[in-house]
Amino acid sequence: MFGMLRALKTHVEAPIVVATRAVSTNAEKLEEIRERLAKGPNFQDFVQNPENSRSEWEKYEGKLRREKGEEQRLRLPPWLKTTIPVGKNYAKIKAQMRELKLSTVCEEARCPNIGECWGGGEHGTQTATIMLMGDTCTRGCRFCSVKTARRPPPLDVNEPVNTATAIASWGLDYIVLTSVDRDDLPDGGSKHIAETVREIKARNSNIFVECLVPDFRGNLECVETIANSGLDVYAHNIETVEKLTPYVRDRRAHYRQTLQVLTEAKRFNPNLITKSSIMLGLGETDGEIECTLKDLREAGVDCVTLGQYMQPTNKHLKVIEYVTPEKFKHWEERGNALGFLYTASGPLVRSSYKAGEFFITSILENRKKRQNATEIAKE
């Protein structure tokens, strides 16, 4: 840039059009660089190191729990460091998201598993999580990095079609649709979400669709709209234990309301798989986690995920404890013992987690095969 300014000063007598052309050329180059940076890994991607082996995990002697009144943040343990997301499919999906002006919770929530999910990973099931209704939420949960506002921009009426068009071209097996909360809308955006599901299924009836939706302030008409939209998995996250809910979640979110939403979704459509998620490391006790798992089973929830809470910025809740992989294994065993169809429990597990979606895909495919066999037998 300084070289360009010196050149302009030296040739000040040159025609204005030459200077304009030079500025234009440099502006184009700058725009090209910006575009390449936008499509490539960000700074956060580079500070994450490759996965450490189990032996390195076991040798780690760093502090894992922050004591009451202690302000210093805990150092990130080795089992929470992930690889840089790369691959053709990762780049393809990221580029098309920009082109169609779609948002993903994978990026907005800074999920550490983005490379694995978008690229296919070891299971070969490629997944992505689209965030509908914009990138601005009407709620302000203290763990979440998504932008907030009382009145976000209006809904994009083209979003259902754009989303379905993009998904059809990606060749995904499983898609998760999540959304911001839109308390400013009479129906909370439930019809918008349902329309998106129908558009996706119209283009590819074989793709499995999971909707990770808000509580709609307990409005059961909204829950019914989503439950009967043609989706395969109805997900709504309880997030944390009952005692911590008022402190961790927005004041409009309630523990018992979440359980009711999950219960009623299954009542409206008994064929649905229902799913919820719990974050660990916020100061909860083992007894409180156990109670939450039992409450979810009593609500008829089929699948549960447990993952480590990660502080997204300095303005959000600090991590109280980094839970060890061994402890997560314990909760996986407890979930299975309580009767969940599937329990995904691990430091990097998130509500929209690839390995869980691979397992749920298997369940749904087996159900479809049994249904087809029954229909053939009737004929």
Swiss-Prot record:
InterPro entries: Aldolase_TIM (IPR013785), Elp3/MiaA/NifB-like_rSAM (IPR006638), LIAS_N (IPR031691), Lipoyl_synth (IPR003698), rSAM (IPR007197). It is an enzyme of class 2 (transferase). The keyword Mitochondrion applies. It is found in: Mitochondrion. It comes from the Eukaryota. Pfam families: LIAS_N, Radical_SAM. This is Lipoyl synthase, mitochondrial. It comes from Drosophila erecta (Fruit fly). The gene is Las.
